[in-house]
Amino acid sequence: MDTQDIVSEISELNLTYLMLAQQMLAKDRDAALFRLGISEELADILLTMSPAQIVKLASTNMLLCRFRFDDHAILGLVTQPHRDKGLQQSQMSILLARQAVEQIN
């Protein structure tokens, strides 16, 4: 895979992510804020963006979504076998909820 292919894939992923974020925010804002890990301010901006603005933002060569499993405890919950899937998901949700939301600086 060459550099141009990677940039194209990143743009496509960004577009999908932004469109999904808008849909999630429109359907259930509180759940979307939690699942996306974003602030109210960022949610407001995403909801007011036009399709043209979404496409323009998506075409950057930088990923707009980020890997939220910075904490080794969260990564361990995902990678280790667990007997009770419901308990595993609850523990992961609690750990993710403790993380700060993304802010616009």
Swiss-Prot record:
Keywords: Activator, Bacterial flagellum biogenesis, Cytoplasm, Disulfide bond, DNA-binding, Plasmid, Transcription, Transcription regulation
One GO CC annotation: cytoplasm
GO biological process terms held by the UniProt record: bacterial-type flagellum assembly; positive regulation of DNA-templated transcription; regulation of bacterial-type flagellum assembly
Location relative to the cell: Cytoplasm
Manganese among keywords: no
Pfam families named in the record: FlhD
Principal subcellular localisation of the protein: cytoplasm
Entry similarity comment: Belongs to the FlhD family.
Oligomeric and partner information: Homodimer; disulfide-linked. Forms a heterohexamer composed of two FlhC and four FlhD subunits. Each FlhC binds a FlhD dimer, forming a heterotrimer, and a hexamer assembles by dimerization of two heterotrimers.
Swiss-Prot/TrEMBL domain comment: The C-terminal region contains a putative helix-turn-helix (HTH) motif, suggesting that this region may bind DNA.
Protein name in the entry: Flagellar transcriptional regulator FlhD
Species the sequence originates in: Ralstonia nicotianae (strain ATCC BAA-1114 / GMI1000) (Ralstonia solanacearum)
Record gene name: flhD
